[in-house]
Amino acid sequence: ALSPNTNAAAARVLDRLGISVTPAAAAGCCGALDFHLDAQERGRQRARRNIDAWWPLLREGAEAIVQTASGCGAFVKDYAYLLRDDPRYADKAHEVAAAARDLVEVLRDEPLESLGLRCDQRLAFHCPCTLQHAQRLGGAVEAVLRRLGFHLTEVADGHLCCGSAGTYSLTQPALSRRLRDNRLDALESGAPDVIATANVGCQAHLDGAGRTPVRHWIELLDQALPGGE
């Protein structure tokens, strides 16, 4: 719900590849923000609600639960641990966590060259902590972007946080802004046309500085589709 443009772009790209997307209308926030705010039981309740929303689709043959925000994806992949002591949900949580995929895990195995993208932008990619550290998918998006012909600039200290860090930008704004400015200095050092990332929190935080535009990487793919914007 925080990034409808991103989800719509993902659906269009997946559709071009012959992958159908079934929205789960009853699914909502993954619960990560509740855990950031020390409201664990409320977060577990959100996890249970999402499991209830996704479960019928898995039973009907859905192959994956695809996340476009790496922070949400990392948290959903942890549902099995979060609900391990819940006798009603432990088994379901294990199956849901096993089905969770970041978008790049789906796209990297597809014949992306068939999309015929027009890629003439210089990109700097900010790899979110939740993608490279939590999900251990560092380099995966960059590999897809290069494979499709985007020019990626060199970015120093790519392992560092942008300062968003869940709710950190709200609870520690001064330090968060300092981390953001340091990250933007590194990202802008190669004079990119746009900065790409893979998490809505990072995107909003970096873009909030009003410097180089920051977009989710799937929106850039969608824009580069033949007939795209």
Residue ranges of model-derived segments:
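Iron-sulfur cluster-binding electron-transfer modules in prokaryotic oxidoreductases
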Residues: 1-229
